[in-house]
Amino acid sequence: MKIRPVGITGLGMAVPERVLTNHDLERMVDTSDEWIRTRTGIRERRIAAPHEASSDYALRAAREAMAQAGVTPEQIDLIICATVTPDMPMPATAALVQAALGAHRAAAFDLSAACPGWIYGVVMAQQSIATGLYDCALVIGVELLSKMVNWQDRKTCVLFGDAAGAAVLQPVSEGRGILSSVLGAEGAGHCHLYTPAGGSRLPASPETVAQGLHYVHMNGPEVFKFAVRVMDEATVQVVEKAGLTVGDIDLLVPHQANVRIIDSAVKRLGLAPEKVVVNLDRYGNTSSASIPVALTEALTEGRVRDGDLVVCVSFGAGLVWGALALRWGR
């Protein structure tokens, strides 16, 4: 069986209109613009309207990616939606996107891998296309985390924002596309970043809501230590797996969670700052949407050129991580 090279042929993103600044948060919780900026690098984030859901933004990002790739809904035969904030527990948000797009030929499912979810979805889609099972996949990362954070908890509410990013994956020319990937997990650290209630362990009830157990709970210091370690380790692993070195990287697209984590990884890797995409100052941590949004903006700004080696790397709840090495182009 011939293994086909697979790459990204279209990108798209969608963010809410409402901007919530650090100064706005000063009026909501006991925090300050200076405290948030110096510890996270975040200045503002986007917040969805009360009536909006993840599928609304997933659909907008998907249509933009499809337009860039030049594909029709009838050509899409696989839709993967990476999210921890689905419209509802079931059915899959991907199925709602499939219906709204009119992509009636497409299989559709959701994937829950927190912040690296989009990378996990890209790897799943790549394998399916490489082996000939599918020809054209849509991989979406979407989160409306504003609906899952406790707006009275200053440790978490300042961190997150809402967004969606999407990519179309198709067969590409030899030597282009995804060269390698690395996925991993340290499940013993699951207790450091999680939402306690709302699942089968603690079904939603008046008691769980009263106790705030449906909100994101985070052990910040432990997550920080994990992130600093795996971000550069995964980057080195994925480029070496492709037979390359860190020095070959033209553009690094890291998960946009905390500028100190990014700076630490970049310093340890020895990369020049101009080779690193950072946009968390404007969007905050958008979880699975983080990397496709950053990659979309980098492409729009002309920072991604044909033949460039692009590396995407992320970490998140699980604790899990993932990285991709791509040779850009079709």
UniProtKB/Swiss-Prot annotation:
Biological-process GO terms, alphabetical: fatty acid biosynthetic process; secondary metabolite biosynthetic process
Record-linked SUPFAM superfamilies: Thiolase-like
Domain text: The last Arg residue of the ACP-binding site is essential for the weak association between ACP/AcpP and FabH.
EC number: 2.3.1.180
Subunit structure: Homodimer.
Identification of the protein by name: Beta-ketoacyl-[acyl-carrier-protein] synthase III
GO cellular component: cytoplasm
General function of this protein: Catalyzes the condensation reaction of fatty acid synthesis by the addition to an acyl acceptor of two carbons from malonyl-ACP. Catalyzes the first condensation reaction which initiates fatty acid synthesis and may therefore play a role in governing the total rate of fatty acid production. Possesses both acetoacetyl-ACP synthase and acetyl transacylase activities. Its substrate specificity determines the biosynthesis of branched-chain and/or straight-chain of fatty acids.
Statement: the UniProt record of this protein carries the keyword Transferase: yes
Catalytic reactions on record: malonyl-[ACP] + acetyl-CoA + H(+) = 3-oxobutanoyl-[ACP] + CO2 + CoA
Annotated gene: fabH
Keywords: Acyltransferase, Cytoplasm, Fatty acid biosynthesis, Fatty acid metabolism, Lipid biosynthesis, Lipid metabolism, Multifunctional enzyme, Transferase
Coiled-coil boundaries: none
One Pfam family this sequence matches: ACP_syn_III
Main location: cytoplasm
GO molecular function terms attached to this record: 3-oxoacyl-[acyl-carrier-protein] synthase activity; beta-ketoacyl-acyl-carrier-protein synthase III activity
Location in the cell: Cytoplasm
Ranges where the record places region ACP-binding: 256-260
UniProt key word Lipid metabolism: yes
Family of this protein: Belongs to the thiolase-like superfamily. FabH family.
Organism superkingdom: Bacteria
Pathway(s) where this gene product acts: Lipid metabolism; fatty acid biosynthesis
Source species: Symbiobacterium thermophilum (strain DSM 24528 / JCM 14929 / IAM 14863 / T)
Catalytic residues in the record: C115, H255, N285
